[in-house]
Each structure stands twice: as structure tokens, then as C-alpha cells.
């Protein structure tokens, strides 16, 4: 009779263990949450000179690690240095002309113009008097009609010269016209724009790395004459590291921007990387062939971009990654 309570006690213990184990399994499943499969994004960029010319030197080769701001290569600078000097001279000329237009005319120039008017007035008065006398002589048939016509022509020419001198004096006294000043200003601005372009062209004859990365290919060698935009290097961008994954509509609410996740690779199954969802595509697409999850292959899915916050050199582009959602990842 004593054995019966013992058996009952053992049964209770076993039942409690089963319940606890089931709860632990269920809780672990809840904590593990959503699992996705993706790949480290392959990000490459073709680097080129924005201007054309002869390649003077290349500072890196295939396989080299490069840093943002590093000089990678240079074209022959001489043509661009000459163009820059010409542009600077053009600005100087245009600036001087504009300054003259703003300053107006000097007192000496106005005095000279006034003297020219007096001289032209005297010449006109003489020509007019001479013409008047010739008219009287022609009426008395002392001179020919041709002589009278010559006197009229001289008078008209003197009158035109006087008007031109008067107009010039009037302009000198009133200063340059607004239209002339505006034209000089526009010429100066055009010369300044040409100078800025020449400076930019000289700057762009040096190829600078836009970001950190690894040089994949070197397409040309020193001495090559390139057209503008011709590819010189292909670079794999190493930072930031992005993981591309896909989620179906059922689990879309778990993949919100800012959500933290754990990232596992085959080489580090017990030491995950940490990431944060940076982008969720607003439109669905058919599942790409690269998606490994069988139950997603026929679904419409949404693309995720996950930014790896603690990436190192072991995380290579194209590498398969397991993305783990869960309370631990979400609250780290």
C-alpha cells in the first residue's frame, strides 16, 4: 500500500516535467521567431575620369584595398592647366571691361568730347556759310550746278560729323547705358563660368576613390588615351555591408524598418552578426530564384535591405546569410 503513493508521486513529477518541457519548447519557438534566408549584397561601381585625356599614372592594382579620398590615378594635367590659364585671362579682361562700364567716362574724356563738338560745330558753320555763298553765285550763274552740289555735300557731311560728336558728348556726360552695363556683366559672368568649368576639369583629371572598397579590375594602363567616362577600375564597395532578404506578406508586419535582427553564416554558426532593417520594398515581386526557402518560391514577397552594424572582413559579398528575428535580436 505504501508503493501506491510513491507511484502517484512519480507520475506527477513526470507529468510536470513533460509540461515544463513542452512550455520550454513552445517558448523557444516563440523566441526564435521568423527566420529568413538571404545573401550579402554585391555592390560594385565602375570608376572613370569625368574628362578625357592620356592616362599619366595609376596608383593601385587588382586586389588592392582602397580608402575613400585616396588618389587612384591621374591624367596628363597639362592641357587642363593651359585651359585654366586661358580662362583666368578671360575673366580679367571681362572684369576690366565691366569696371569701365560701371565707372563711366573720365573728365578728360568728356573734355575731349566737348572739344570735338566745338571743332565739328566750327566746321559745320564754315560749310554752311560756304554753301550759302555758293547758292548766291549759282543764282548769278557764276558757278556751275556741280560746284553748288559739292558745297551742299560738304555741308551735309559737316552736319553729320557735328551730330555724331554731340551724341558722343551726351553719352559721356550721362554715362554708359544700362543695356551696355548689363551686357558687360553678362560677359563677366560667362567668363567666370568658363573659369569654374576649367577648374573642375583640372580637378577631375585626378581620379579619387568615392568610398572604401576592394579593386576588382583594372581596365587600362598608363599611356592609354581615354574618352570621358571610360571605365578605369571596377571596385567592390565594402562599407556599408547590406544583406538582401525577402519576406512574404504573412510575416511582413515583423519586418519593419529599424527592427534589429541576428545574422548567421555557415562559417560562424554560433557567433551571429547584428543587423537592422533599413529598407522594406513598398511593392511585392515574384520570388527570385536565389531564395532558398521552399515555401516562398511561389509567393509574392517583399525585398528587405538589412544593414550589418558589426560587419568584418569575413563577411563577403554574395555569401548566404540566415536572418533570425526574435525577442533577443529585437531588444539588443
From Swiss-Prot:
SUPFAM superfamilies assigned: HlyD-like secretion proteins, Outer membrane efflux proteins (OEP)
Coiled-coil portions: 145-207
Induction context: Repressed by the transcriptional regulator CecR.
PANTHER family the record matches: EFFLUX SYSTEM COMPONENT YKNX-RELATED (PTHR32347), UPF0194 MEMBRANE PROTEIN YBHG (PTHR32347:SF29)
Family in the record: Belongs to the UPF0194 family.
Main function: Could be involved in the sensitivity control to chloramphenicol.
Entry GO terms, CC: periplasmic space; plasma membrane
Knockout-associated phenotype: Mutant shows increased sensitivity to chloramphenicol.
GO BP terms: response to antibiotic
Signal sequence range: 1-20
Annotated gene: ybhG
Primary site of residence: periplasm
Keywords assigned: Coiled coil, Periplasm, Signal
Keyword Membrane recorded: no
InterPro entries reported for this sequence: CusB_D23, UPF0194_membrane_YbhG, UPF0194_transport
Protein name (record): UPF0194 membrane protein YbhG
SS bond partners: none
Organism field: Escherichia coli (strain K12)
Subcellular location: Periplasm
Amino acid at each position: 500500500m505504501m508503493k501506491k503513493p510513491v507511484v502517484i508521486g512519480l507520475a506527477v513529477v513526470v507529468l510536470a516535467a513533460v509540461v515544463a518541457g513542452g512550455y520550454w519548447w513552445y517558448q523557444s519557438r516563440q523566441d526564435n521567431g521568423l527566420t529568413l534566408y538571404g545573401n550579402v549584397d554585391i555592390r560594385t561601381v565602375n570608376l572613370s575620369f569625368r574628362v578625357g585625356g592620356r592616362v599619366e599614372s595609376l596608383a593601385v592594382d587588382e586586389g588592392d584595398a582602397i580608402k575613400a579620398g585616396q588618389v587612384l590615378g591621374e591624367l596628363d594635367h597639362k592641357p587642363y592647366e593651359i585651359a585654366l590659364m586661358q580662362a583666368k585671362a578671360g575673366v580679367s579682361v571681362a572684369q576690366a571691361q565691366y569696371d569701365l562700364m560701371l565707372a563711366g567716362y573720365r573728365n578728360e574724356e568728356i573734355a575731349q568730347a566737348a572739344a570735338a563738338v566745338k571743332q565739328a560745330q566750327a566746321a559745320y558753320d564754315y560749310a554752311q556759310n560756304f554753301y550759302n555763298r555758293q547758292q548766291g553765285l549759282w543764282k548769278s550763274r557764276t558757278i556751275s550746278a556741280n560746284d553748288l552740289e559739292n558745297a551742299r555735300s560738304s555741308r551735309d557731311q559737316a552736319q553729320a560729323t557735328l551730330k555724331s560728336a554731340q551724341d558722343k558728348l551726351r553719352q559721356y556726360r550721362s554715362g554708359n547705358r544700362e543695356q551696355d552695363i548689363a551686357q558687360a556683366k553678362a560677359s563677366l559672368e560667362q567668363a567666370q563660368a568658363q573659369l569654374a568649368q576649367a577648374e573642375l576639369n583640372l580637378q577631375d583629371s585626378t581620379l579619387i576613390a568615392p568610398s572604401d572598397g576592394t579593386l576588382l579590375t583594372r581596365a587600362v594602363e598608363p599611356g592609354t588615351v581615354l574618352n570621358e567616362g571610360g571605365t578605369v577600375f571596377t571596385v567592390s564597395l565594402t562599407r556599408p555591408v547590406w544583406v538582401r532578404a525577402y519576406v512574404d506578406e504573412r510575416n511582413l508586419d515583423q519586418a519593419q524598418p529599424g527592427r534589429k535582427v541576428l545574422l548567421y553564416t555557415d562559417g560562424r554558426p554560433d557567433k551571429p552578426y547584428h543587423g537592422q532593417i533599413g529598407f522594406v520594398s513598398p511593392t511585392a515581386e515574384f520570388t527570385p530564384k536565389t531564395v532558398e526557402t521552399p515555401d516562398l518560391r511561389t509567393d509574392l514577397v517583399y525585398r528587405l535591405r538589412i544593414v550589418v552594424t558589426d560587419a568584418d572582413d569575413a563577411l563577403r559579398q554574395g555569401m548566404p546569410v540566415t536572418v533570425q528575428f526574435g525577442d533577443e535580436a529585437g531588444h539588443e
